[in-house]
C-alpha cells in the first residue's frame, strides 16, 4: 500500500504537466478566417451593371455569410448592400476564397436553386447562376406575369432573385375582330404576323389595365408597369412631368439616379424621396398610333400617411374657389414638393411649395388634391384607350389627345373607361370637348421654360393693358416691367411706352396663348420679324413667379443657352 503523500505528489505533478501543455496551444490559436463566397460582384465586373436593378433592395446584408452559397453581398442602388448572384470572369490566375478543399468535382453535388448550375471554383464545387443563354427565341410566359425570350432567361431571372418561377399559359390578344374562325383561346407560344401582313393588320397601342395612383413612404421602393398591346408591338418610353423643365425621356435598360427602366419597360424607383413625387407618363408608339398614360406617385414621410388620410375624410368641405387659384410658388423659406389642382388641365400636378400660404391650393398627396377639387367628372377625352383584360374584342373609337384625332382600338368588353365610343362620329361629337361647350383645353407651349427662353428672340416681364381681337389674329399692348432678353428690337430705348405684340393664328373661341388683360404679371416669350414682336399659339406665356424669374436669371448668368446651342440647333 502506498503512502498518502505518494498520491498527493503525483497529483500535483500531473496538474503542472497539463498547464505546461495547454499554454503553447493557446499561443498557437489561429486567427478567425473571414469567409468569402466565390465570384465577384456585378458592378466589379462592369461599372454599368448595377446590382438589384429589378428587385426591392430589401435583401440587405453585411457579409457574404448572410447570403446563399451562390451569392455575394454587393453594393446596390439604394446605398446599402444586397445578396445577389455572383458573377465570374474567365481570367487565368484569379484566386478564389481561401480554406476550401481542392480537386472536388460536381459529381453528386446538387444545386437546388432554379437556374443555378454547379461549377468548380478553386477546387470547390459551388452553385452559380447561369450567365449564358441560347439565342434562339422560344417566348415563355412565367408565373411572375412576364414573358421571357426563352426558358433559360426565365430560369436565370429566378436564380438572380432567389425565387422559383414556373411556366404558365400565355394570354393571346387579338389585334382586331376577325371573320375567320377564332384561333385557340390560349397558346404557349404567341403567334406573330409576318412582315407582309403588318400593313393590313395593324392596331394602335391600348392599355390592358387602368393606370393606378400609388402613395409610398420615404425610403420605400415603387414600380409602375405600363401593360400595353398593339400591332406591331409598341415601343415604350417613360418620362416625369417636370415643372418649368424639359422632361427626360427614359427607355428600357436606362438608369438615372434612383430611377430605373427595366428591360421589360417597367419603371422602378428605389429609396423614394419627396422630390420623386409627381406624374410619370408612359408613352407607347407604333406605326398605327401613339398612347400616353399617366401614373401619379405621392410620397409621404413616415407617420404622415395616416394623418393625410384622416384629414381628407374629416367631412370639412374644401372651398371651391381655392381650387381655381394658381399654385403658390413664392419662396418664403423651405421648399417642398406639393400637389395643386390645375383647372385648365382638370387634373392635379406637382409644384414647388415655398410655404408662403397665400392660398389653400396645395396638398400632400395626389389623392387628397383630387378629393378636394375634382368636383366634376374626369375629362374623359384625356384618358388613354383602355382594352381591358376581357376577350370580347370589339372595335371601338377613342380620342387621342396627342394627335387630336379619334382613332380605332380593340375593346375587350370589360373594365374600360369613358374614352370609349361605338363610332367615329360619336367620338368626334364628344371630344376634345362636347360641341357647343366652351370649355377649352389648356394652352401648351412647344417647349418648357429654359428651352423657350433660349429659342425666343425676346423675353419680357409685363402686364397686358389692352387686347384687340381680329379675324384670326390680334394685338396686345404690354406694359413692360423688365426686359430679360432682346436680340432684335432695342427695347431698352422704349422707356415706359407699352410694347405692341401681334398674335398670329388665333382661334378666339379658345385662344392660345392665353393672353388676358389684367394686373397679373406675365412672362412673355416670342419672335421678332421685321422689327415686330409676335406670339404664336405655342409661344410661352405664363404667370410670373419668384422661382421662375430666379431660374431665368440663373440661365442668363450661367450662359446656359450657349451650352445648349448645339443641341437646340440655334444659330
UniProtKB/Swiss-Prot annotation:
Family annotation (InterPro entries): Elafin-like_sf, Ig-like_dom, Ig-like_dom_sf, Ig-like_fold, Ig_I-set, Ig_sub, Ig_sub2, Kazal_dom
Residues annotated as domain Kazal-like: 121-172
GO cellular component: extracellular region; extracellular space
Annotated site (Reactive bond): 135-136
Domain of life according to the entry: Eukaryota
Domain WAP as annotated: residue spans: 34-87
Signal peptide: 1-29
Keywords for this protein: Disulfide bond, Glycoprotein, Immunoglobulin domain, Metalloenzyme inhibitor, Metalloprotease inhibitor, Protease inhibitor, Repeat, Secreted, Serine protease inhibitor, Signal
Record-level GO BP terms: muscle cell development; negative regulation of transforming growth factor beta receptor signaling pathway; roof of mouth development; skeletal system development; transforming growth factor beta receptor signaling pathway
Keyword Disulfide bond assigned: yes
Location of the protein in the cell: Secreted
GO molecular function: receptor antagonist activity; serine-type endopeptidase inhibitor activity; transforming growth factor beta binding
Tissue: Widely expressed, with high expression in skeletal muscle and heart. Also expressed in brain, lung and testis. Weakly expressed in liver and kidney.
Positions of transmembrane segments: none
Residue span(s) of domain BPTI/Kunitz inhibitor: 323-373, 381-431
Keyword Secreted belongs to the record: yes
Domain Ig-like C2-type: residue ranges: 205-298
Ranges for domain NTR: 440-561
Function field: Protease-inhibitor that contains multiple distinct protease inhibitor domains. Probably has serine protease- and metalloprotease-inhibitor activity. Inhibits the biological activity of mature myostatin, but not activin.
Subunit details: Interacts with both mature and propeptide myostatin/MSTN.
Family per record: Belongs to the WFIKKN family.
Official protein name in the record: WAP, Kazal, immunoglobulin, Kunitz and NTR domain-containing protein 2
Species name: Mus musculus
Gene: Wfikkn2
Amino acid at each position: 500500500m502506498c503512502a498518502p503523500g505518494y498520491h498527493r505528489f503525483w497529483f500535483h505533478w500531473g496538474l503542472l504537466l497539463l498547464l505546461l501543455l495547454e499554454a503553447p496551444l493557446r499561443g498557437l490559436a489561429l486567427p478567425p478566417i473571414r469567409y468569402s463566397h466565390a465570384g465577384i460582384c456585378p458592378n466589379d465586373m462592369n461599372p454599368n451593371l448595377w446590382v438589384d436593378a429589378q428587385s426591392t433592395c430589401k435583401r440587405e446584408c453585411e457579409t457574404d455569410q448572410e447570403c446563399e452559397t451562390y451569392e455575394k453581398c454587393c453594393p446596390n442602388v439604394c446605398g446599402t448592400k444586397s445578396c445577389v448572384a455572383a458573377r465570374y470572369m474567365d481570367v487565368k490566375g484569379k484566386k478564389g476564397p481561401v480554406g476550401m478543399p481542392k480537386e472536388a468535382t460536381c459529381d453528386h453535388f446538387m444545386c437546388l436553386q432554379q437556374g443555378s448550375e454547379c461549377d468548380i471554383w478553386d477546387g470547390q464545387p459551388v452553385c452559380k447562376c447561369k450567365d449564358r443563354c441560347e439565342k434562339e427565341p422560344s417566348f415563355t410566359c412565367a408565373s411572375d406575369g412576364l414573358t421571357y425570350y426563352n426558358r433559360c432567361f426565365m430560369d436565370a431571372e429566378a436564380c438572380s432573385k432567389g425565387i422559383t418561377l414556373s411556366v404558365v399559359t400565355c394570354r393571346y390578344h387579338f389585334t382586331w375582330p376577325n371573320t375567320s374562325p377564332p384561333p385557340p383561346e390560349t397558346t404557349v407560344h404567341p403567334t406573330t404576323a409576318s412582315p407582309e401582313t403588318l400593313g393590313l393588320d395593324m392596331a394602335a397601342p391600348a392599355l390592358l389595365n387602368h393606370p393606378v395612383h400609388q402613395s409610398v413612404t420615404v425610403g420605400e421602393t415603387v414600380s409602375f408597369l405600363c401593360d400595353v398591346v398593339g400591332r406591331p408591338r409598341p415601343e415604350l418610353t417613360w418620362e416625369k412631368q417636370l415643372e418649368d423643365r424639359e422632361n427626360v425621356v427614359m427607355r428600357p435598360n436606362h438608369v438615372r439616379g434612383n430611377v430605373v427602366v427595366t428591360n421589360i419597360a417597367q419603371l422602378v424607383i428605389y429609396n423614394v424621396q419627396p422630390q420623386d413625387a409627381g406624374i410619370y407618363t408612359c408613352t407607347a408608339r407604333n406605326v398605327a398610333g401613339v398612347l400616353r398614360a399617366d401614373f401619379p406617385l405621392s410620397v409621404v414621410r413616415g407617420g404622415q400617411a395616416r394623418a393625410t388620410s384622416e384629414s381628407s375624410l374629416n367631412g370639412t368641405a374644401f372651398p371651391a374657389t381655392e381650387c381655381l387659384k394658381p399654385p403658390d410658388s413664392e419662396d418664403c423659406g423651405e421648399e417642398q414638393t406639393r400637389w395643386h389642382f390645375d383647372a385648365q388641365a382638370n387634373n392635379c400636378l406637382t409644384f414647388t411649395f415655398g410655404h408662403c400660404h397665400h392660398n389653400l391650393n396645395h396638398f400632400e398627396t395626389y389623392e387628397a388634391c383630387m378629393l378636394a377639387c375634382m368636383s366634376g367628372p374626369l375629362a374623359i377625352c384625356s384618358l388613354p384607350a383602355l382594352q381591358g383584360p376581357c376577350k370580347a374584342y370589339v372595335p371601338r373609337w377613342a380620342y387621342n389627345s396627342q394627335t387630336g384625332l379619334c382613332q380605332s382600338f380593340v375593346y375587350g368588353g370589360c373594365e374600360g373607361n369613358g374614352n370609349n365610343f361605338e363610332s367615329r362620329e360619336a367620338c368626334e361629337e364628344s371630344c376634345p370637348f362636347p360641341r357647343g361647350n366652351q370649355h377649352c383645353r389648356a394652352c401648351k407651349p412647344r417647349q418648357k421654360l429654359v428651352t423657350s427662353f433660349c429659342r425666343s428672340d425676346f423675353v419680357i416681364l409685363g402686364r397686358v393693358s389692352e387686347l384687340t381681337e381680329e379675324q384670326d389674329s390680334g394685338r396686345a399692348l404690354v406694359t413692360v416691367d423688365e426686359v430679360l432678353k432682346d436680340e432684335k428690337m432695342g427695347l431698352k430705348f422704349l422707356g415706359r411706352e407699352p410694347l405692341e405684340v401681334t398674335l398670329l393664328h388665333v382661334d378666339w373661341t379658345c385662344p392660345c396663348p392665353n393672353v388676358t388683360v389684367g394686373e397679373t404679371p406675365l412672362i412673355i416669350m416670342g419672335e421678332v420679324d421685321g422689327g415686330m414682336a409676335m406670339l404664336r399659339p405655342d409661344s410661352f406665356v405664363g404667370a410670373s413667379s419668384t422661382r421662375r424669374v430666379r431660374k431665368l436669371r440663373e440661365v442668363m448668368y450661367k450662359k446656359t443657352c450657349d451650352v445648349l446651342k448645339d443641341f437646340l440647333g440655334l444659330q
